[in-house]
Amino acid sequence: MGLPWYRVHTVVLNDPGRLLSVHIMHTALVAGWAGSMALYELAVFDPSDPVLDPMWRQGMFVIPFMTRLGITNSWGGWSITGGTITNPGIWSYEGVAGAHIVFSGLCFLAAIWHWVYWDLEIFCDERTGKPSLDLPKIFGIHLFLSGVACFGFGAFHVTGLYGPGIWVSDPYGLTGKVQPVSPAWGVEGFDPFVPGGIASHHIAAGTLGILAGLFHLSVRPPQRLYKGLRMGNIETVLSSSIAAVFFAAFVVAGTMWYGSATTPIELFGPTRYQWDQGYFQQEIYRRVSAGLAENQSLSEAWSKIPEKLAFYDYIGNNPAKGGLFRAGSMDNGDGIAVGWLGHPIFRDKEGRELFVRRMPTFFETFPVVLVDGDGIVRADVPFRRAESKYSVEQVGVTVEFYGGELNGVSYSDPVTVKKYARRAQLGEIFELDRATLKSDGVFRSSPRGWFTFGHASFALLFFFGHIWHGARTLFRDVFAGIDPDLDAQVEFGAFQKLGDPTTRRQVV
């Protein structure tokens, strides 16, 4: 049978045994990829600096997902939080990877078995002896089982009743760790940044799934509904399954890109909106102001800013800065962060404090402009010297560092001042090692960006797939030219047109 590539799946259309087989094989491929990818990432991952070289800077994709579910230790003796451990146990990164690979192998064997032994009694209708699936009943079984899994995850794993809990952090991604989470049953449970909502929603959705599954197992659909929604057609199952998948893909693309309790910034990196809104910058200034109010010096106040918080306030960690086709991790772009140089404060010769305007997300280049506390432009790096009025040289700008490696160091020569003014456009200033990975200096996106792009793209593709297969199953008779209520046996193929009234008939 010479089928075109886009019609090859018709071979399992009326073959339940082999339909099951190819789905088991697909599960084997997915689990095998996950386990293999985890082992690859563990082979290249450097856990030595969780502050300046976290997993998301290194381009890790599956390690963050394991970590948010409670895996923090490695058989290599390290912990994701930076410490060392002696007994990681079976549920370590390598243990989870190995479990996926073993599961993949078992699924592979099961797929082969079901391909060979495809003609099982369970797939046959007792009355006709032909292959037949009770799709509403199967739907009820699957709904019930997924409800049990959903409820179990929320009630046991997330809450720590039987499991580790999940990754929970503060709003600024500084104190994250795996811990049990109590369900949030109030209105706060609907806040996407409240971890308790994860527990309560899984418990509620799981309960609903269990009840709905039992309903569909005990109540048969009305005949009119059964026929209207083509519940006896396997392509209906395909269409509705695709709908569930694309809807989920759109949802997770949103929670990843805009941020939520399910996508902590310590594991996936900050969101672009945290740069756009000056989220970390405001918190840093708040802490410095609080320090000054306690009679600390400017140097002392800035020295107490956590390096981790300062690093978030750097445009190179913005996932929207990476180009669409720039492959590689963030470390391959601007380099591996080595240390915070400190916060530069610029002043003109009259002693006014000046602030460098920060580069917006979607700019590759941006003019260097320094404004005072009232937003009035006081200095810049001009494009044409002949026209300049506010150049660093003319205004006499100096820079002094507070906190970090250059704490207390000041510069007055214009070349150095301009260098740090350009770097201040990009947020807090860090020393970056470009030599180790031969980094090219061009920003890359984080796994947050990759995940969002991939899931949004496939969601759109699957949306069209849902429309396509839904239309095919609902209007099958129209497309085939066959009346669904046809009670005469028709010899199709005897004439060029299906449904030709001159076609030979034989009354049943």
UniProtKB/Swiss-Prot annotation:
MF annotations from Gene Ontology: chlorophyll binding; electron transporter, transferring electrons within the cyclic electron transport pathway of photosynthesis activity
Gene3D superfamilies: Photosystem II CP47 reaction center protein
UniProt entry keywords in alphabetical sequence: Chlorophyll, Chloroplast, Chromophore, Membrane, Photosynthesis, Photosystem II, Plastid, Thylakoid, Transmembrane, Transmembrane helix
SUPFAM superfamilies, sorted: Photosystem II antenna protein-like
Highest rank taxon of the organism: Eukaryota
Keyword Acyltransferase: no
Family matches, as Pfam families: PSII (PF00421)
Main location: plastid
Cofactor note: Binds multiple chlorophylls. PSII binds additional chlorophylls, carotenoids and specific lipids.
Record field: transmembrane: 21-36, 101-115, 140-156, 203-218, 237-252, 457-472
Gene Ontology cellular-component annotations: chloroplast thylakoid membrane; photosystem II
Membrane topology: Multi-pass membrane protein
Annotated InterPro entries: PS_antenna-like, PS_II_antenna-like_sf, PSII_PsbB
Any single GO BP term: photosynthetic electron transport in photosystem II
Location of the protein in the cell: Plastid, Chloroplast thylakoid membrane
Family: Belongs to the PsbB/PsbC family. PsbB subfamily.
Function text: One of the components of the core complex of photosystem II (PSII). It binds chlorophyll and helps catalyze the primary light-induced photochemical processes of PSII. PSII is a light-driven water:plastoquinone oxidoreductase, using light energy to abstract electrons from H(2)O, generating O(2) and a proton gradient subsequently used for ATP formation.
Quaternary state and interactors: PSII is composed of 1 copy each of membrane proteins PsbA, PsbB, PsbC, PsbD, PsbE, PsbF, PsbH, PsbI, PsbJ, PsbK, PsbL, PsbM, PsbT, PsbX, PsbY, PsbZ, Psb30/Ycf12, at least 3 peripheral proteins of the oxygen-evolving complex and a large number of cofactors. It forms dimeric complexes.
Protein name stated in the entry: Photosystem II CP47 reaction center protein
Provenance organism: Manihot esculenta (Cassava)
Phylogenetic lineage: Eukaryota, Viridiplantae, Streptophyta, Embryophyta, Tracheophyta
Encoding gene, per UniProt annotation: psbB
